[in-house]
Amino acid sequence: MAETLQLNSTFLHPNFFILTGFPGLGSAQTWLTLVFGPIYLLALLGNGALPAVVWIDSTLHQPMFLLLAILAATDLGLATSIAPGLLAVLWLGPRSVPYAVCLVQMFFVHALTAMESGVLLAMACDRAAAIGRPLHYPVLVTKACVGYAALALALKAVAIVVPFPLLVAKFEHFQAKTIGHTYCAHMAVVELVVGNTQATNLYGLALSLAISGMDILGITGSYGLIAHAVLQLPTREAHAKAFGTCSSHICVILAFYIPGLFSYLTHRFGHHTVPKPVHILLSNIYLLLPPALNPLIYGARTKQIRDRLLETFTFRKSPL
C-alpha cells in the first residue's frame, strides 16, 4: 500500500523509472518472448554477418555494399538498444531503469531511427546515380563519398535528437516513476511530467515530420529519376534488370516506413481509441522487425551477398 502511494506521488528528478511492459497483460506477456526473442536473434545474426562479409570480401568494397554494411550496423544498434530490456521485462516482469540510463536509451533509439532513415535515402540516391548515370557512377559515388555521407548522417542524427533528452531533463517534477512501456520512449516519459510539455511535444512532432517527410521526399524523388531512366532503356530485359537492382531496397523501405506509419498514426490519432498494448506492440514491431527482415531481404535478393554467405557458412571456395 505504501509503495502504491509512493508511486502515485510527485517526484523531483527520480533516481529511476520502472518499466512495466504491456499494461493489462500481466504474466501473459511472458509468451511474447517467443515472438521477440527469435526476432532479436535473427537481427543479431543477420546484421552481424552482413558487415563481416562485406569487410572480409574485397570484391564487395563498393558503395552499394558499403551502404548495406552501414545499414546493418545501424539496425544492429537499434535492435540492441531496446531488445535486451524488452525481453527482460517480458520474462522477469517490471524492472527499474536509472534515470540517466533512460535518457541515454531515449537518445539512442531516436538517433538510430533517424540514422536508418537517412541511410535509406543515401541508398536511394546511390541507385539513382547507378541507373541514371551509369557511365559517371564510379566518379560520382566513391568509397570516400560513402564515408563522408555516413559521417554526415550520424552527425545530423545526433544534432537533431540531442534536444529530446535535454528537454526531458529540464523538467523537475514527475507524477510517477512507472512507465507503461517496454523501453524509455520519449512520449511515454513525457506523459509522466508535471508541467507544460507543449514545447517538447511540438518538437517531437516537428522532428518526426521533418526526418521522415524529408527523407521520404528524397527517396520518392530518387525513384522518380530511376523510373525516368528505366523508361529510356530499349528492352524489357533491361527494364527487368534495372528494377531488380532496386527491388531489395524497395522492400527494405516498405519494411521500415509502413510499420512506422501505423505506429505514428495510432499514437497521434488513436490515442483514446486504440488500446495501449497495441500502441506498444506497434512501437516494438517498428523498431525490431526491419532489423530482422533487412538481412534476409538483401541476403536472398542480392546475388553477391547471397553467394558470399553461402561460401562462408558452407566452407566452399569461390571460383577463381
UniProtKB/Swiss-Prot annotation:
Residues the record marks as carrying a glycan: N8
Stretches in topological domain Cytoplasmic: 52-59, 126-144, 223-242, 301-320
Annotated localization: Cell membrane
GO molecular-function terms, A-Z: G protein-coupled receptor activity; olfactory receptor activity
A family per Pfam: 7tm_4
Gene Ontology, cellular component aspect: plasma membrane
Keywords: Cell membrane, G-protein coupled receptor, Glycoprotein, Membrane, Olfaction, Receptor, Sensory transduction, Transducer, Transmembrane, Transmembrane helix
Function: Odorant receptor.
PANTHER family hit by this protein: OLFACTORY RECEPTOR 52W1, OLFACTORY RECEPTOR 56B1-RELATED
Name of this chain's protein: Olfactory receptor 52W1
Gene: OR52W1
